[in-house]
C-alpha cells in the first residue's frame, strides 16, 4: 500500500493564566470606581453558581471582602436554576461541595426557592428572579464565560445566562427553557437578561474565563451597561477555542 506524504507537526495551545488571583480581582474591581455606588450598610447579593469553576471560593471571597471594605453588607444567594434537586437545602449542599459556606465566606448564605415576577418577555412569559436578590440594594453577578454546548452566538454561557437562568431558581429556569424550546436560546437569554438589567439593581458583574486546562485565564469586572459587549469579547479569549465559522 502506498501512503501519502506525511509531515510531522506540533500543536501549540495558547493557555494564558492569571498569576495573582486576588490581586487581579482587586485591581479589576477598583477599576469600576464604585465608591459612590456602594452605600454604607447596603445589602448586596452576590451570586454563587453550581458549576465547578476553578478557584470559585477564592474569587467569591475576594469580591465579598471588597464589598466589606466599602462598608456594604454582602450575602450570597445560590444562583443555579433547578440544580441541587431544586431545593434550598440541596443548593446549599452544592455550594458546600465547592467550599462555599458561611464559615469560609464570612457572610450569610440566603438560600430560598422563592421568586418574584419582575416583568414579561416579548413572548409573554413571566421573568422570575430570586426574591431575596430582588429585594437587595444591589446584585453582583459572577459566572464563568464560555461556549455553550447547545448553541453558538455572541452571548452563550456567562453573565446573561446567570441572570436569566441561575437567578431564576427552579421556576424561572423552567420558564426560560420553555421559551428557548420555541424561540431559541440566542433570542431568549439576552432578552431575559436585559429585562433583569433594566429592572433590578445590578451593581456589577465578574466574568471568569478559563483556559484549556481549566485554570483561570482572565477575570474581568464589568459594569452593567457593558455586559453584552464584554461577554461577547471574553467568550473565546481563554485560548484553545476555535469558533466554527473561523474554520
Regions found by a protein language model. Give the residues of each.
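Catalytic cores of enzyme domains
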Residues: 144-247
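Short glycine/serine/threonine-rich phosphate/pyrophosphate-binding segments
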Residues: 53-60, 85, 148-151, 162
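Active-site histidine-anchored catalytic micro-motif
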Residues: 57, 73-90, 120
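Histidine-anchored nucleotide/phosphate-binding helix
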Residues: 54-73
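Glycine-rich phosphate/diphosphate-binding loops that line cofactor/substrate pockets in enzymes
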Residues: 29-45, 68-71, 246
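Short glycine-rich or small-residue beta-strand-to-loop segments that form or flank ligand, phosphate
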Residues: 43-52, 75-80
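An acidic, phosphate/nucleotide-engaging active-site surface
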Residues: 90-154
Amino acid at each position: 500500500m502506498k501512503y501519502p506524504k506525511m509531515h510531522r507537526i506540533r500543536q501549540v495551545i495558547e493557555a494564558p493564566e492569571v498569576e495573582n488571583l486576588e490581586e487581579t480581582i482587586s485591581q479589576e474591581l477598583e477599576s469600576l470606581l464604585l465608591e459612590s455606588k456602594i452605600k454604607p450598610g447596603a445589602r448586596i447579593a452576590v451570586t454563587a453558581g453550581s458549576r465547578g469553576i476553578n478557584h470559585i471560593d477564592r474569587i467569591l471571597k475576594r469580591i465579598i471582602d471588597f464589598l466589606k471594605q466599602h462598608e456594604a453588607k454582602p450575602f450570597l444567594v445560590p444562583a443555579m436554576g433547578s440544580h441541587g434537586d431544586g431545593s434550598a437545602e440541596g443548593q446549599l449542599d452544592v455550594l458546600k461541595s465547592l467550599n462555599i459556606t458561611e464559615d469560609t465566606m464570612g457572610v450569610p448564605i440566603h438560600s430560598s426557592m422563592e421568586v418574584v415576577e419582575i416583568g414579561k418577555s416579548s413572548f409573554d412569559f413571566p421573568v422570575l428572579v430570586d426574591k431575596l436578590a430582588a429585594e437587595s440594594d444591589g446584585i453582583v453577578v459572577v459566572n464563568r464565560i464560555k461556549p455553550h454546548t447547545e448553541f453558538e452566538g455572541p452571548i452563550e454561557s456567562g453573565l446573561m445566562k446567570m441572570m436569566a437562568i441561575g437567578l431564576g431558581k427552579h421556576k424561572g429556569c423552567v420558564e426560560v427553557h420553555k421559551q428557548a424550546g420555541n424561540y431559541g436560546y440566542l433570542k431568549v437569554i439576552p432578552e431575559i437578561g436585559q429585562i433583569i438589567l433594566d429592572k433590578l439593581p445590578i451593581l456589577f458583574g465578574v466574568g471568569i474565563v478559563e483556559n484549556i486546562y481549566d485554570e483561570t485565564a482572565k477575570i474581568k469586572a464589568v459594569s452593567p451597561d457593558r455586559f453584552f459587549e464584554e461577554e461577547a469579547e471574553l467568550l473565546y479569549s481563554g485560548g484553545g477555542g476555535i469558533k466554527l465559522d473561523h474554520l
